[in-house]
């Protein structure tokens, strides 16, 4: 199994090598063009040599671009593999992507991000957090496009290991950003879990109607968990009727007995007869 530290070391090494390779290729390209423009004695021979070198370089760039595009297309399948539990297949492909050479960084960065997703799905929270931070450390356009999903993964991983300060920092960087609907739903779930852990119950029920509406758009398990947090917050604030209404909505979505295992705090609420 590929460890987070090994993957990051490999990624950083390959990024350094690709930078050096791009510089060397640029020097060769300039040399080839200069040779092709030679007009002194023997210039036509240098022109042929320069033209041949230029053709080889263009072929190399084309091949690298094709391989990068192919790797990026393969990477598009990894989230589906992870979501359906095909962890070994996803890991093999990610490992191959991180091992292959490319002068471009995009496929490597996608591999690192998807490895973070895989470790998160496997509940290996510490490794997921390390990988997310490695992605966020990259100051390139591709990394910026992965910043929001990486921060959401980072926040959840840190919540699971009890690092509330780190989770808050990750979440706070998302508040001022424009999020997709899926990202907004994930952020709401993380906000509620964080607020529950720190006892910020009034903040949890603030804007309740909008939160319930957003929960209705979520997958069943996420909708149940979101409304369960809202129900618990209302209960802690003494709003029994609201807590009961939200708790009943949770019961309509999931099996209460199984859900008590996932969220033991609901046992107290349901056993009291508030719901």
Pin down the residues of each PLM region.
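N-terminal topogenic membrane-targeting module
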Residues: 61-140
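TPR repeat positional signature
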Residues: 74, 112, 151, 188-191, ...
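Structural signature of alpha-solenoid helical repeat junctions
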Residues: 69, 106-107, 144-147, 183-186, ...
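Long, non-transmembrane cytosolic or organellar matrix-exposed soluble domains/tails
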Residues: 198-275
């Amino acid at each position: 199994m590929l460890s987070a530290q090994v993957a990051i070391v490999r990624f950083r090494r390959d990024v350094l090598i690709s930078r050096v390779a791009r510089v060397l290729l640029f020097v060769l390209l300039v040399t080839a063009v200069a040779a092709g423009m030679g007009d002194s004695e023997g210039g036509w021979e240098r022109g042929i040599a320069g033209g041949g070198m230029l053709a080889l370089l263009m072929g190399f760039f084309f091949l690298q671009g094709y391989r990068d595009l192919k790797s990026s297309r393969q990477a598009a399948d990894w989230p589906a593999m992870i979501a359906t539990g095909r962890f070994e297949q996803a890991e093999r492909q990610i490992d191959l992507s991180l091992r292959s050479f490319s002068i471009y960084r995009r496929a490597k960065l996608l591999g690192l991000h998807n490895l973070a997703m895989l470790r998160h799905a496997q509940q290996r929270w510490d490794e997921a957090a390390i990988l997310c931070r490695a992605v966020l450390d990259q100051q390139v356009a591709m990394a910026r496009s992965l910043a929001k999903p990486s921060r959401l993964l980072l926040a959840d991983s840190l919540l699971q290991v009890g690092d509330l300060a780190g989770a808050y920092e990750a979440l706070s960087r998302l508040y001022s950003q424009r999020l997709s609907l899926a990202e907004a739903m994930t952020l709401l779930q993380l906000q509620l879990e964080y607020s529950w852990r720190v006892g910020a119950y009034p903040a949890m029920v603030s804007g309740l109607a909008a939160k319930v509406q957003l929960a209705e758009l979520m997958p069943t398990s996420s909708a149940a968990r979101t409304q369960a947090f809202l129900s618990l917050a209302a209960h802690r604030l003494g709003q029994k009727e609201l807590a009961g209404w939200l708790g009943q909505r949770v019961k309509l979505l999931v099996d209460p007995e199984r859900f008590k295992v996932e969220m033991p705090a609901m046992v107290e609420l349901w056993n009291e007869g508030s719901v």
